[in-house]
């Protein structure tokens, strides 16, 4: 018998050895779950609505009254592997030290060191091994036992450290222990992410590893029409990955609800707060039963994120991989050139000549404004470089196309603004070039972290101008911590009187010789009808028609 696209005979009860029976699990009688005192299906959320299609302000339920009416659920699935159990405290301490791992909280499970030790059921473990991973990352070694134990948790680790699988795989186990969705039910797992690009990437991982369990997922984000997302939600999805604003839209018009959510993930919590999503996050979380399991993931641990965790996590445990001090990956070579605005264009060409010596190069260039993105891209294409731009003025279809062209290497140069690039995770980026420096040191670290991921090496090049002097001291500190060469021209900005500002890196490897211009992009060098010096930008390279 099938129900809602999921095979009723797909039996996960053989997972009993990991935590007893799951109170019926996903193959139990759904009628017992649907026999709720509040009645009916969940469409319309708490309190219902008289007009299903009209936006209604979300009201926080009275959980003292509502929670006793809801069915109980299982969230602790962790059974410690005997190899893990037999490790001594000194061995565990040494492992955590080697992986720069800091923990806080009580009754924290020991870290695992192999996929088999995690205790995932075969239907999850087989998917992981099929991807060819050698061993878990540091955050996964400690994060999986934490998440599988059902505890609220905070995970702090650098971008690209494997955080997505740290919550995705335990989420799949969690779903398979719950009763099946009934018509009108919302998701069981909700993942909130700051950007549509990150949301789509999370969806890709959920689809890949949830396939064997026939788990459905839906990605809900702004910038595109709601119609397809509404259809997907109406069919029922165990996992919803969403940006906060669009999810609130869907909740207010009654197209989904959060009454079945028992596993909540806040991914890149620091970025969501940086982007001003705190009110939306609080409004969403208030709609979710308070006995849920909540997992918060972040690259940094500022006071705003700490406060959010204090307000919504219950007796959390925490793991941090790396220092709490802001730092850059030591796999990244940081090169900084102190330049004028008029020198940037020549320096950019120099580094592209170097990067292009690698036949599989990918270079991500950051600019400060949408206009500058387009200007740089136009100039590069006229000069024969295969460049495309991505920023907020482009519609979602074009953004997706540009990202795909960059990802598969057909256009190995992408120019982006910070907002457009947030959440983008593209494998194999060799170079990051900060044509314009970001507004703060955190964004600098986040930008250059697009290269040098998952053990690979990368190069970050930054053009630092006099206007960026406020970032000088912090930039130098980041470089020193990573044992980078600091150019003498930058050292004059090493003054503690400068507060937060913008780092500007530039740098130079010498070029490796000529680069044959690629055909088929743009229209040669002539005929550009504009002054390249507008926006303080291109300067005069002595070429005709510029």
From Swiss-Prot:
Residues 498-540 have a biased composition (Gly residues). It is found in: Cytoplasm; Nucleus. The modification Dimethylated arginine is found at residues 509, 512, 518, 525. GO terms for cellular component: cytoplasm; mitochondrion; nucleus; ribonucleoprotein complex. Residues 144-319 form the Helicase ATP-binding domain. PANTHER family: ATP-DEPENDENT RNA HELICASE DBP3. This is ATP-dependent RNA helicase DBP2. It comes from Saccharomyces cerevisiae (strain ATCC 204508 / S288c) (Baker's yeast).
